[in-house]
A protein has these predicted regions:
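N-terminal secretory signal peptides and thylakoid transit peptides that target proteins
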Residues: 1-18
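C-terminal extensions of enzymes
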Residues: 14-17, 384-424
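C-terminal segment of N-terminal export signals and the immediately downstream linker at the start
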Residues: 24-71, 87
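Metal- or metallocofactor-binding catalytic centers and their adjacent structured scaffolds
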Residues: 42, 87-159
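Conserved, mostly hydrophobic/aromatic
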Residues: 85, 148, 161, 208, ...
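Shared catalytic-loop signature of beta/alpha-barrel
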Residues: 115, 122, 136, 262, ...
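Glycine-rich, aromatic-flanked loop segments that form ligand/cofactor-binding clefts
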Residues: 149-185
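Metal-dependent enolase-superfamily TIM-barrel catalytic cores that perform enediolate-based chemistry
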Residues: 174-290
């Protein structure tokens, strides 16, 4: 059984190699004392209290006059307008908003009408408190909040002439290296490898992620023996030059998760996502403490303080806020900055739907502590273009758009044909 330090040392070496922390910090992390832990807690609280949004260039109130939810086919669009006629557009997670839209219409959108959009960041807390909205905390509330935040950020960007990345502290990079992810489970290892080959052919990606286990399955595999065979076969097929990640989607208890993790270590995988039940923080930590492979998690977490626990206690090595499930860019960047303060990495979880691939790229561009590759799913049916980016994965990279707001144009005909969604 490997001591917990082995994982810290493994992660520390990776961080040092990436230039994200110094070797001195690595050594000090290994020899952490109670005083160090108290100091870390203070740093995390300081990060949570530090503003993310930068709107200093807007010296007059930006009063929101309306916030609409529009639907075109299976896609939604949020349109926010000011009393002066300025407009911002956001594309929410339609996969979930189709079920939760009454919360958006009845609780989220009305709250923002009449408010100064420049105060978006403190308003997120006021919205949480307003009308007992905190009782709805979870995906149902935060997907709706993210939908509103995206549109307001686009509005603020267009009014200030700044990109969303600039509003959030500045993009550190325009070229984002991506990994392609398979959502398959239950097919044979041979069929899955053929699918992964096609993803690489289509994108030029130098990193891949696929699924293990059976999803919340109490150790059951989707097919008998699939996981073990697939872990080996993918590495043997793509060789050591391909970076490999794998996602268990809460499939295992601690013992089984460690067993699978050991196999992933043998085949030199780069991270192991959500090995145990996502809400069993202690189980995930117990697994991570026994493995050298970095453990990633946080996709389902909707609380800043849930992430604070993970980071403070080293429950994971890589935090994965979902930009929709966690309520938008601002809240997710707080998580990333807490992780950075603790010497951990961050990568956005991409829940698919809408323009999630673009959201993930913008977020990754703003990180001081990204993993080398960011998830890309560019299979949108929304007609969108950019003058500064193809919005496609080319040679394993996506180029971040420049320009105000999201830096994109959604076909005006698509917007004009979208039907307002009203409360019932």
């Amino acid at each position: 059984m490997r001591p917990a330090l082995s994982r810290r040392f493994f992660l520390g070496r990776s961080l040092v190699a990436a230039g994200l922390v110094s070797s001195t910090r690595q050594v000090s992390a290994a020899a952490a004392t109670d005083d160090d832990q108290v100091a870390l807690e203070h740093r995390l609280d300081e990060v949570l209290a530090t503003p993310v949004l930068r709107v200093d260039s807007l010296d007059k109130p930006v009063v929101i006059a309306s916030m609409e939810l529009l639907r075109n086919g299976r896609n939604f669009v949020v349109r926010v307008r000011t009393s002066d006629g300025a407009e911002g557009i956001g594309v929410p997670n339609a996969m979930h908003l189709v079920h939760t839209y009454p919360i958006f219409l009845n609780r989220v959108a009305p709250f923002f009408v009449g408010k100064d959009a420049r105060q978006l960041e403190p308003l997120l807390w006021e919205l949480y408190r307003h009308n007992d909205n905190y009782k709805y905390q979870g995906l149902a509330l935060w997907v709706c909040v993210a939908a509103a935040e995206f549109a307001i950020l686009d509005l603020l960007g267009k009014l200030s002439g700044r990109s969303i990345g600039d509003l959030l502290g500045g993009a550190k990079r325009r070229q984002i290296a991506v990994y392609r992810a398979s959502g398959n489970r239950g097919n044979t290892p041979e069929v899955e490898v053929a699918y992964l080959k096609q993803l690489v052919t289509d994108s030029g990606a130098r990193a891949l992620k696929f699924r293990l286990g059976g999803r919340m399955s109490k150790n059951a595999d989707s097919l008998p023996g699939r996981t073990e065979k697939l872990i080996a076969l993918v590495r043997e097929t793509f060789g050591k030059e391909m970076t490999l990640y794998a996602d268990a989607n809460s499939s295992y208890d601690v013992a089984e998760a460690i067993k699978i993790g050991r196999l992933m270590e043998e085949y030199e995988y780069a991270f192991y996502e959500e090995p145990c039940r996502f809400d069993h923080f202690e189980d995930t930590k117990a697994v991570a403490d026994q493995l050298s492979i970095p453990v990633a998690g946080g996709e389902q977490e909707f609380s800043d303080y849930g992430f604070r626990w993970m980071i403070k206690n080293r429950g994971v090595d890589i935090v994965q806020p979902d930009l929709h499930y966690h309520g938008g860019f601002i809240r997710s960047l707080r998580v990333a900055r807490m992780a950075h303060a603790a010497g951990l990495l961050c990568t956005p979880h991409m829940s698919g739907s809408g323009l999630g691939f673009l959201d993930a790229a913008i977020f990754a561009a703003c990180l001081d502590n990204p993993v080398p590759f960011t998830e890309f799913k560019g299979d949108t049916d929304i007609p969108v273009s950019s003058a500064t980016s193809s919005l496609k994965c080319e040679n394993g990279m996506i180029t971040l758009p420049t320009g105000p707001g999201f830096g994109i144009t959604i076909d005006p005909t698509f917007i004009s044909k979208a039907v307002p969604v009203t409360s019932f």
